[in-house]
Amino acid sequence: MRKDAKENRQRIEEIAHKLFDEEGVENISMNRIAKELGIGMGTLYRHFKDKSDLCYYVIQRDLDIFITHFKQIKDDYHSNYEVMQVSLDYLLQFKIDNKALLQCIEAGNNKLRFYQSAFYQELFDFYYDLFKSDDDTYTKFKTDMLLQSLSTSVFAFQIEHRHISIEAYRNYLLNIYLDEVERND
């Protein structure tokens, strides 16, 4: 990418991040970002496919930091129960802190893109390793189902409409996804 194109892209990300922080992700359109920057929509869409794509890049630095700390959990805790409990606490807090950006990313036109993202793959690998069994198909299924239950929309629905506390949500997931032996370790 040319230097001026890189600078343009970085400027777009910075202004989008500022506007998202000030007015909320849901209140800012791609058109508003382009007007704020004094650029055409074509320039904006040359860098980002849609708002979901832009949100992914805006949060990318935070995702990288999150993944670094997330991976450390396996080194700091030894039982599957502890690893799962601490990782869920960390992930759920991250979802609370970044709810609007994550909802935008997950609600994008190309939902498959989120499931193919490095972030999703890191989460998948982390929990797949935790659930690993002789039945690879089952382990993949179990991991995908956990991650689906951790989607921002499912989490928000349970907290906001079912009025489940975050701690209860975490504990329910522990009960569903860890067998009794692992829970009592």
From Swiss-Prot:
One term of GO molecular function: DNA binding
Is Lipid metabolism found in the keyword set?
Answer: no
Q: Which UniProt keywords apply?
A: DNA-binding, Transcription, Transcription regulation
Note the superkingdom of the native organism.
Answer: Bacteria
Residue ranges of the annotated DNA-binding region, renumbered to this chain:
29-48
Q: Name one Pfam family in it.
A: TetR_N
Domain (HTH tetR-type): give its ranges: 6-66
Spell out the protein name for this chain: HTH-type transcriptional regulator SAS2464
